[in-house]
Amino acid sequence: MKILLIGYGAMNQRVARLAEEKGHEIVGVIENTPKATTPYQQYQHIADVKDADVAIDFSNPNLLFPLLDEAFHLPLVVATTGEKEKLLNKLDELSKNMPVFFSANMSYGVHALTKILAAAVPLLDDFDIELTEAHHNKKVDAPSGTLEKLYDVIVSLKENVTPVYDRHELNEKRQPQDIGIHSIRGGTIVGEHEVLFAGTDETIQITHRAQSKDIFANGAIQAAERLVNKPNGFYTFDNL
């Protein structure tokens, strides 16, 4: 499989290493600013890469969105987070002409977490719910795309939900419909996501901890391996 990388930060550098270990080939890289240290052919436009089988994106909205407005037809794996609604609308439009896969978190364990959460929410309907995510001190967006995904699962199963991002400004007791959303940034934390169900005299915590960023890179590669054989359409872990 011949792979075009969109972005060449820490994540796509891991994708390159792991993909080559699996026998795949990196045929090019698209970056905001070309760098002499990048060990692959650099391009400005997706359509310029004639021999790619798939593109894997671990970048940012500033790089990705202009590329999505260009004319190209290439299976696309997208892991960029930020400006989610705009991104999903654009990917849905593109999926009419090419297979597109999107996940805010490329870990299959996180996908499993969403399924566990979907089963737990109806069972614990009268429990308060708090969501917490923790990442390294260089992560820019908050809350993480994964935490937003967990929140979306809850919203799909509960009515009149209210996200609460900054409780100290409210100066009032917690309301039953509140969903607390908390972000922690520090050190080299790879990624942690926790759902707390707090009831009367008991709590339940569901946690996913990433031990290495390789799980995200491998998840993207595995998605690409499946996507190249799919018809046009929008794919997630649910239907890939």
Curated annotation (Swiss-Prot):
GO MF: 4-hydroxy-tetrahydrodipicolinate reductase; NAD binding; NADP binding; oxidoreductase activity, acting on CH or CH2 groups, NAD or NADP as acceptor
Reaction(s) this enzyme catalyzes, per UniProt: (S)-2,3,4,5-tetrahydrodipicolinate + NAD(+) + H2O = (2S,4S)-4-hydroxy-2,3,4,5-tetrahydrodipicolinate + NADH + H(+); (S)-2,3,4,5-tetrahydrodipicolinate + NADP(+) + H2O = (2S,4S)-4-hydroxy-2,3,4,5-tetrahydrodipicolinate + NADPH + H(+)
Pfam families in alphabetical order: DapB_C, DapB_N
Positions that bind NAD(+): 79-81, 103-106
Entry-linked PROSITE patterns: DAPB
UniProt keywords, alphabetically: Amino-acid biosynthesis, Cytoplasm, Diaminopimelate biosynthesis, Lysine biosynthesis, NAD, NADP, Oxidoreductase
Pathway of action: Amino-acid biosynthesis; L-lysine biosynthesis via DAP pathway; (S)-tetrahydrodipicolinate from L-aspartate: step 4/4
InterPro entries: DapB_C, DapB_N, DapB_N_CS, DHDPR_bac, NAD(P)-bd_dom_sf
EC assignment: 1.17.1.8
Compartment(s) where it occurs, according to its Swiss-Prot or TrEMBL record: Cytoplasm
Magnesium keyword on record: no
GO biological process terms, semicolon-separated: diaminopimelate biosynthetic process; lysine biosynthetic process via diaminopimelate
Keyword NAD applies: yes
Family classification: Belongs to the DapB family.
NCBIfam families: dapB
Function: Catalyzes the conversion of 4-hydroxy-tetrahydrodipicolinate (HTPA) to tetrahydrodipicolinate.
The name this protein goes by in its record: 4-hydroxy-tetrahydrodipicolinate reductase
Upper taxonomic lineage: Bacteria, Bacillati, Bacillota, Bacilli, Bacillales
